[in-house]
Swiss-Prot record:
This is tRNA-2-methylthio-N(6)-dimethylallyladenosine synthase. Residues 147-379 form the Radical SAM core domain. Catalyzes the methylthiolation of N6-(dimethylallyl)adenosine (i(6)A), leading to the formation of 2-methylthio-N6-(dimethylallyl)adenosine (ms(2)i(6)A) at position 37 in tRNAs that read codons beginning with uridine. Belongs to the methylthiotransferase family. MiaB subfamily. GO terms for molecular function: 4 iron, 4 sulfur cluster binding; metal ion binding; N6-isopentenyladenosine methylthiotransferase activity. It catalyses: N(6)-dimethylallyladenosine(37) in tRNA + (sulfur carrier)-SH + AH2 + 2 S-adenosyl-L-methionine = 2-methylsulfanyl-N(6)-dimethylallyladenosine(37) in tRNA + (sulfur carrier)-H + 5'-deoxyadenosine + L-methionine + A + S-adenosyl-L-homocysteine + 2 H(+). Keywords: 4Fe-4S, Cytoplasm, Iron, Iron-sulfur, Metal-binding, S-adenosyl-L-methionine, Transferase, tRNA processing. It comes from Ruthia magnifica subsp. Calyptogena magnifica. GO terms for cellular component: cytosol. [4Fe-4S] cluster 1 binds at residues 11, 48, 82.
């Protein structure tokens, strides 16, 4: 039996893509996933270019795999994802032993690319197979039906981003925004529900820009998609990520009132609490607009958990800009954040800006942001002690007599119960809260 090993860096979209890669190659070549790279026949690296040192991580991993290839000349090594899309030729220059290079939009072509390597044209030397083109949404037309044994699943509803924020590489590596047809998404959710999935997380780089074509020629927005997906038998909870504030519409806010299955958690990145920095980032909105949207949402869902991304030390960020960010963190009471020190992404507009914030200052500011939000996380978790929370039971916990699930606001929750409860939403009386974790007792 031929084996496939996939190493995934980056976001949920990459995780989704890696799952699809496994499905595609199992369907076409009978490759079976393994957790042991040394035993695999095909090694694939699905890369992310969002953060600094993406290339270094890539070549460090490839260096390890080269040792395996030195021992087994038939081993096939492939690189996909956003770094592959951005740096395809460079990868071959530095790692000529790589056999396949593919982009986020061409993973569906992996079977033919693999065949090119496995069965080269007679009389021709074996050459690497490269395809980092942007065939828009075509990849979704050539994927096998989804398969999963989990009660949660990601569903990609769109690709790319057209915002061109000055710091972001995504439009250059995944292309412009392209939405999947409405019925295709709904059918995928239906198939997953039949397989036992109870929670779907709708994915997109800018998911609330979704504009799915319906059979009648009309366009469905994210709010309508959520509404219809919630009506599918078996689906008990819906999430979506990642959103952009400029397209967090009133119809989407109303969905929190109309769709009880829509989880009380929103990841809405703002990146900075300074209007000046938001302008330099070309985010397209001001802080007051962001706060207004959150205020409207909390009128409908007072207990909703809000998380964000923050870029610390963006070029031009002075002390007042940073204090504005800290003020916003206090005012919103962010539950969680993905916070990073700014690093220039080659090819973006911001890479031409003078990076004028001292690294020690960046580190100090990042530490303060993380400390403040960690305190918020702890405070919210402790405030949940004594409450009854609806938990989607996902699996058996490491302690075998315990089950594991998550609250609507993404708290990992452990409690004693029978594994027959997996896939159900149960009521749990919370007895302990620490960090992002809760402990509780099952209410019969």
């Amino acid at each position: 039996m031929k084996k496939l090993y996939i190493r995934t860096f980056g976001c949920q979209m990459n995780e989704y893509d890696s799952n699809k890669i496994a499905d595609v190659l199992n369907h076409s070549h009978g490759l079976v996933l393994t957790d042991d790279a040394a035993s695999a026949n095909v090694l694939l690296l699905n890369t992310c270019s969002i953060r600094e040192k993406a290339q270094e991580k890539l070549f460090h991993q490839l260096g390890r795999w080269r040792k395996l290839k030195d021992k087994n000349s038939n081993l096939i090594i492939g690189v996909g994802g956003c770094v592959a899309s951005q740096e395809g030729e460079l990868i071959l220059e530095r790692a000529p032993y790589v056999d396949i290079i593919f982009g986020p939009q061409t993973l569906h072509r992996l079977p033919s690319m693999l065949n090119e390597v496995l069965t080269p044209t007679p009389g021709m030397s074996v050459k690497p197979s490269i395809d980092i083109s942007f065939p828009e949404i075509e990849k979704f037309d050539h994927l096998p039906k989804p398969k999963t044994s989990s009660v949660t699943a990601f569903v990609s509803i769109m690709e790319g981003c057209s915002k061109y924020c000055t710091f972001c590489i995504v439009p250059y590596t995944r292309g412009e925004e392209v939405s999947r047809p409405f019925i295709d998404v709904i059918n995928e959710v239906k198939i997953l529900a039949i397989q036992g999935v109870r929670e779907v997380n709708l994915l997109g780089q800018n998911v609330n820009a979704y504009q799915g074509l319906m059979d009648d020629g009309e366009i469905a927005d994210l709010a309508l998609l959520i509404n219809i997906a919630a009506q599918i038998d078996g689906i008990k909870r819906i999430r979506y990520t990642t959103s952009h504030p400029t397209q967090f519409s009133d119809s989407l806010i109303e969905a929190y009132m109309e769709v009880p299955k829509l989880a009380s958690h929103l990841h809405l990145p703002i990146q900075s609490g300074s209007d000046k920095i938001l302008r330099l980032m070309k985010r397209g909105h001001m802080v007051i607009e962001y706060k207004s949207k959150i205020r409207k949402l909390r009128k409908i869902r007072p207990d909703i958990s809000i998380s964000s991304d923050f870029i610390i030390g963006f070029p031009g960020e002075n002390e007042q800009d940073f204090l504005d960010t800290m003020t916003l963190i206090d005012e919103i009471g962010f539950d969680k954040s993905f916070s990073f020190i700014y690093s220039a992404r080659p090819g973006t507009l911001a890479s031409s800006y003078l990076d004028d914030v001292d690294m020690d200052v960046k580190k100090q500011r990042l530490a303060l942001v993380q400390k403040t939000i960690d305190k918020n996380t702890e405070r919210i978790s402790k405030s949940m002690v004594g409450s009854v929370q609806k938990i989607l039971v996902e699996n058996v916990a490491k302690k075998r007599d315990n089950l594991f699930g998550r609250t609507e606001n993404m708290r990992n929750t452990h409690f004693k119960g029978d594994k027959s409860l997996i896939g159900q939403i149960v009521n749990i009386k919370i007895t302990q809260g620490r960090g992002n974790s809760l402990v509780g007792n099952l209410i019969a």
